């Protein structure tokens, strides 16, 4: 199970059990996009899961590389992360970066989680990275997205949370034309959804 988490992620947020027989590699902190491909060589089957900004990062990392993908799932993100029609509207992204602060981060997390209960659950996982680290990561992503744009990497399925307040669902639908879409009643970050996906349960991992 190879999981590219979203911007601002860290290990504490995704300490979930995975399906028996699978190893678990979590990728986060995109201040650099360096990836050691030898870590996943030798596997006969790899499940790729990417969330939010991790969708663009994974697309960038694996374009031109072939691995034995069992399934490639994108969750609440698109290959066009800064885009008025297919991602986060450009002015919103730029405003977040230009005015980034502890207060900005707190507001973002509330919007990402969608409810006070979900926000409390998120914070109970004790995120430890500093606001300055997260600002640096967001700035690095902005530079990379501007420099490289989208890639030709093909995803098998896109999962769209109908209550997502970060990547508007309408924009996600626009971005994923030609890709199989599954809709779910979820916020941008939904603990139960990630628990299910990382455990390998549910129809999301089933080929139709």
Feature locations, PLM:
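Short beta-strand/loop motif that positions the catalytic acidic residue
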Residues: 158-160, 164
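Gly/Ala-rich beta-loop-alpha elbow adjacent to hydrolase catalytic centers
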Residues: 49-58
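Short alpha-helix in the alpha/beta-hydrolase fold that links the catalytic acid
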Residues: 16, 154, 165-178
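Flexible "cap/lid" loop of the alpha/beta hydrolase fold
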Residues: 63-99, 127, 136-139, 194-198
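Catalytic active-site module of serine/aspartate enzymes centered on a nucleophile-bearing elbow/loop
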Residues: 178-208
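Conserved alpha/beta-hydrolase catalytic His-Asp/Glu region
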Residues: 102-142
């Amino acid at each position: 199970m190879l999981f590219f988490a979203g911007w601002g992620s860290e290990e504490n947020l995704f300490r979930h059990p995975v399906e028996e027989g699978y190893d678990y590699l979590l990728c986060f902190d995109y201040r650099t996009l360096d990836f050691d491909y030898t870590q996943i060589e030798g596997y006969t089957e790899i499940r790729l899961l990417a969330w939010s900004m991790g969708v663009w990062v994974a697309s960038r990392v694996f374009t031109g590389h072939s691995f034995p993908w069992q399934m490639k799932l994108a969750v609440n993100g698109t290959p066009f992360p800064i885009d008025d029609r297919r991602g986060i509207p450009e002015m919103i992204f730029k405003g977040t970066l230009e005015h980034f602060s502890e207060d900005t981060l707190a507001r973002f997390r509330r919007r990402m989680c969608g409810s006070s209960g979900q926000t409390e659950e998120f914070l109970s996982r004790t995120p430890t990275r500093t606001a300055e680290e997260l600002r640096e990561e967001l700035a690095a992503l902005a530079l990379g997205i501007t420099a490289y744009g989208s890639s030709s990497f093909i995803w098998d399925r896109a999962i769209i949370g109908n209550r997502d307040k970060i990547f508007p669902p309408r924009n996600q639908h626009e971005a994923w034309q030609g890709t199989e879409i599954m809709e779910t009643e979820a916020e941008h970050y939904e603990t139960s959804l990630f628990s299910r996906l990382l455990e390998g349960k549910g129809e999301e991992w089933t080929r139709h």
